[in-house]
């Protein structure tokens, strides 16, 4: 691939970088200046920014600012520079931080002390690097960091392995690389770069620049890379990658050192061996001391004597206070920290106040304050890879996944904006410019509330979100919290005061933008004499307030706006209205049994096999076996108990393997052997008795408290007597009202002769109704039942009793009914249809007409092609809206899918006359009133 470019020359101000420092395009750098140097730099634009060529360059690269500067690397005789845009000047107490963002390369034609004529070449194409070598480099980096930090190797039984690990840590090159590559901004950038190169598509020129900026390549290679063009630049880049791979694979291989170390035991006596090792260690310590002296951290004044600075235990705090201007800390906070440190120096170290104040300053120093002189890499997160990561971790949960992808898309667009913040220059009385405060970030992290029953994966989804974003993860359990100081921190006047849980999470994660999970927020303590912790959450979770969150222990504002808060709850309505209003609610429904089968095969079984020490093919379970466990051994919306059962089977297989009698296959008949008898034996029907007449029994559908659906049998028996209805079976208030509506509606139909037939037939029905005492019972009387969705079931049950006409056992129904016979929509359609399917005998279900949209949503939810799903969803909704306007119904793809998947025929009913026509296929009809009301 060739490199084509157009070039033009422009005169720009010059900023010469410190020694061995180099800027690269696409990276944001923050550099600390003293105030006079910053003013000198700003004053150079008074004439330059009016240049037409400068304006043309700014326009060509999409820059809203014309404040361009040629940043010359800190390397002798450099004829190359990086053209940067100055995003802003940020005033500190004694210094000024200038934010540069690299725009493009420049080649110096002529220069003096303050200005340079720079030739800018705009490249339109750059050859792609060898991504295999890139992936190899990232693998080497991961292996090196993992091995270097592995404390477990020090306890290894292999003496040679222990020696190799210790010698690696003694290697200066390894120590320096670990320090640089472990930095939070560098590690996050490398992680995103690995994902970007793994896609084998994208802006590789930008990715290459970011990698050269992140990795500590030699300055000669960096200069050569900056200077080169087109295909030559790729050659230099490949040399950089080859150099880094050689460092990890050869120079950091301590096997040879370990051999020499162990050979001391064989080539000399034990005493001589110990002497050699002692000399090695003493030489290291001596040279380390010289290095410390070279850095100016220690001054030796004479043999055996040290200065007071050597014994100053507050040296680290002093260094932190001296460098406060390099951190993004509130100005009031900087003043308070400096004041407290001055007070600390006046105290006696033996006093209790000294220890309290020192502990406070150490906590402040340990917080991950953002450095203003660090650079910000802007590698975009790959949405396709993020989607793959979320799908690999969790099954379903489409609404939550789509919300995370939306946030990533917005984050990518913010990263692509140039510049991030347009500098705002405010000129005073003279020619010297001053600057405004740093503007707040316009990108606010969303605050999500995942609500749903236990065990559906809310907590693990939050962890997966952190992995996808490449951020640190912290979990805070707020269930039962009854002291607001646990969140806001304790004031330092109290004995044993500590920061709040939010600040502690920042300190543990060493990041100012982690993903923080606030678990079980619906179970947080209520008002007490210690304050209301839920009210404390209002400030934390409000994007307009948490930019200045005030922790009582810290004592000055902290910016929490870049934290991604994810909250979880089981009951959404346990939260107060103000708190609920601050969060984006994402409802996670319980899994149906088909989903549990898929989750078991893809996630639970492989995970439990690994935990049991078995191979991935050591256990084989078919869908029928897994479904049996899900339906007969568990009754839950989530998968926790199901995973425990699978774990028990895997442990049983592990025992069999050790006994030499293991087989792979686990069938339905083997379940009792491994996990015992089912917790409840589900019957497909209550069964008919010998004296049952057959009528007065109807199958309803229920949505259970555990998030599942099931068949619910309604039974009615009539006795001679005055007309009344008794109800048993622990029925709730709403269900009892539905029974009264059913009784009244049937009486109304009979008294008004609305049942089709001869007058003699109608009179007989009315007489039978008026002289029958009805008893309604819903089996499983120990379980309380409530809700309006059994309205048509009870009405049909009473009508069946009066007509003495049997309702087919293969039929089930659900729907609320009104006094006028209208059938209203209900909830839990998805779960109820699955419950009808699992009953084993139902092949036809009556649903309210207005619930067709729920069937459509379930059909769309189960489509794997999300783009196609969105198109079909819009199409079906438009079609459904038109059908409702015309008063028609339609059976299309969603209904066909239900029949193919669950074996259920869906019939939609709009009023009770539709129910009768569908149940008895036209044998029983209503005439007059209700039919006329529909017309």
UniProtKB/Swiss-Prot annotation:
Gene3D superfamilies assigned: 1.10.8.60, 1.20.5.5270, 3.30.230.10, P-loop containing nucleotide triphosphate hydrolases
Highest taxon of the lineage: Eukaryota
Active site as annotated: 789, 832
Single GO BP term: protein processing
Reactions this protein catalyses: Hydrolysis of proteins in presence of ATP
EC number: 3.4.21.53
This protein's GO CC annotations: peroxisomal matrix
Top enzyme class: hydrolase
Motif (Microbody targeting signal): 933-935
Molecular-function GO term, any one: ATP-dependent peptidase activity
Role, per record: ATP-dependent serine protease that mediates the selective degradation of misfolded and unassembled polypeptides in the peroxisomal matrix. Necessary for type 2 peroxisome targeting signal (PTS2)-containing protein processing and facilitates peroxisome matrix protein import.
HAMAP family linked: lonp2_euk
Name of this protein: Lon protease homolog 2, peroxisomal
Organism listed in the record: Pichia angusta (Yeast)
Gene for this chain: PLN
